[in-house]
């Protein structure tokens, strides 16, 4: 891939083909519910229906530079070039934020129907004068 346009209804890409042939505005068909904007250098499988080289269609775009390795049979992952991923492992779901925040938005609530464990602090009202659970325990313990 040499270029990408994610604004159109059907994403299009600029591609350099095997013999160095360049193609612009090649439609990239994506599976329903999934979309991505691949980095330059990603690889594509392009079909030319009826052998018509004037209208290619990229049916698969992959980038082996960033592909997660070592998945067990049956495991599935969603990933990017920054180390962020969601992996459906045989033991459970693993979300790797790649060192960035994980933000949930536009929901009426978050409900967890299981025990919650944290190795870090839990803070309430984090955008105002919230306190961590540890700070609240210190305040509470001082009253007893």
Language-model segments: what does each one mean?
Residues 41, 78, 87-88, 93-132, ...:
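Low-complexity, small-hydrophobic/phenylalanine-enriched stretches
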Residues 42-46, 138-144:
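Extracellular disulfide-bonded cysteine-rich modules/repeats
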